[in-house]
């Protein structure tokens, strides 16, 4: 499929709950649509997901299109989560994918197994689930993903992990953060939105290992110095009472968390860096 045709399909899908992007009957080795397509826009996601919808909203969720396919007794459920932008799709993917086990030849970031395939492409997070669990169905998950890759244009992504040098990063530990739910996977800094990300600013995190030891580093880029400075001030004022500030610094502070480990908040220009999980005080 040509890029122009893929873009036309994407435009058409935007007005139809993304139905135009779904693989047709007979795709992936003979699977056919089994039930009416379901579309859950906005807050209706709560009617589709039994827990865990909030992280989608934090990153920026628009709608999910759900289609079930059958081939004899085999069944596959395909979910197309349209997010607000490519980084939103990547953020949810990184938080859910675990250790990636890619299939050969699939030109999109993904992880594939016997029971499920998860893929990020453009503004979409795609989840294909093998409902019967038969090993013979696993290739169909990859086949449907190939079909979707041809229909959904790729989108360029900024290198949000550039500040976390590759030679220091622990592979597979990369995550994105746009609010307190994603941040809470690493540390509870305070109530509300401690880093003032507001679902719009995308912070990057990863485990880093160097002379300081192994720790988690979070880098948040703000629109300007004033916004970053205000975020540090707000964070310091609303810091979780279980966190002890050990030393105030010109543009941040050093702390000990509730587990007895150490961390640092530091601002440099319009960027805030948070280090957590240090064995020794910096």
Protein language model regions, located:
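Soluble, non-membrane globular domain cores that form compact, hydrophobic packing
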Residues: 2-77, 81-282
């Amino acid at each position: 499929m040509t890029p122009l045709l893929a873009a036309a399909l994407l435009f058409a899908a935007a007005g139809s709950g993304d139905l135009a992007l779904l693989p047709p009957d007979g795709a992936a080795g003979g699977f056919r649509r089994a039930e009416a397509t379901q579309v859950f826009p906005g807050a209706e996601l709560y009617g589709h997901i039994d827990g865990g919808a909030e992280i989608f909203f934090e990153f920026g969720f628009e709608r999910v299109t759900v289609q079930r396919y059958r081939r004899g007794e085999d069944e596959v459920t395909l979910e197309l989560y349209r997010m607000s932008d490519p980084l939103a799709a990547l953020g949810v993917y990184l938080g859910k994918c675990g250790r990636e086990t890619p299939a050969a030849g699939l030109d999109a970031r993904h992880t594939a197994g016997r029971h499920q395939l998860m893929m990020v492409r453009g503004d979409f997070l795609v989840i294909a689930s093998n409902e019967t669990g038969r090993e013979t169905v696993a290739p169909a998950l990859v086949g449907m993903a190939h079909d979707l890759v041809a229909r959904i244009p790729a989108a360029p992504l900024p290198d949000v992990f550039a500040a976390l040098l590759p030679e220091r990063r622990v592979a597979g530990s990369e995550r994105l953060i746009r609010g307190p739910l994603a941040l809470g996977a690493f540390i509870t800094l305070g109530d509300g939105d401690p880093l003032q990300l507001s679902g719009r600013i995308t912070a990057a995190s990863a485990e880093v290992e160097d002379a300081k030891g192994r720790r988690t580093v979070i880098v948040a880029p703000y629109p300007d110095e004033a916004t970053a400075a205000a975020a540090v001030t707000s964070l310091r004022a609303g810091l979780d009472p279980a966190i002890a500030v050990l030393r105030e610094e010109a543009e941040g502070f050093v702390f000990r968390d509730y587990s007895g480990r150490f961390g640092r908040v530091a601002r440099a220009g319009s960027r805030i860096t948070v280090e957590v999980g240090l064995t020794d005080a910096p």
